[in-house]
Amino acid sequence: MTIKTVLFDFSGTLLRIEPAEEWLRGTLAATGHVLPEARVVELAAELERVGAQPGGAPGAPVRFPDARTAELWPVRDESAAAHRAAYTGLSRHVPLPDDALHEELYARHMRPEGWRPYPDAHDVLAGLRARGVRVGVVSNVGWDIRPVFRAHGLDAFVDAYTLSFEHGVQKPDARLFATACGLLGASGPETLMVGDSREADGGASALGCAVHFVEHLPVTSRPAGLRPVLGLVDAGA
């Protein structure tokens, strides 16, 4: 069947959050905190290890600092409040020099400068637009990612965004994919879902969508991971 619509995941698929050291270093600089470089490296590694950076290392944290954070984790992407509380809860597991830094770190991850598009993202999205293929972004996320796409010149290629926190449901629930298809006037069998999570993004198959997976890697380690999407569309997936 002809592929008329492609849905993309956001984090780890089209864009990737900055490395944890840059995330922490930028936050410290913006708030006037100065730490020895060795301590910055150590704290960044700890933040990454506990899973405190949204969009960072995939997978659930090894352990949770408290019962409330553990309770929020499975539903963190269903509301902005749950997302913030879950990630700042994990961050507070790491002793930073100022408690306010936990909220500042969370705020930084929502800013466009904290995200890097994968090297081939622009060209692949432009290629889909040139082919007349509709494009949607379907993301498990707790904040509005549209400004990130605008800042990086990708928004012009996206026809609709379906963000979990705006609908109170998260992938792999088929309802989120159904909402995305509905916004684009698409049916499942004529849609290709592209993502990095077999568990979350694989949920699109319940609607009859074809699914293509990419690896969740740093942008420097995945220069052409999205390019096969154009071939799949040309071949009808």
Provide a role label for each language-model segment.
Residues 1-8, 38, 96-101, 122, ...:
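Asp-based, Mg2+/Mn2+-dependent phosphohydrolase catalytic module
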Residues 3-119:
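N-terminal helical cap/lid subdomain that shapes the substrate entry/recognition surface
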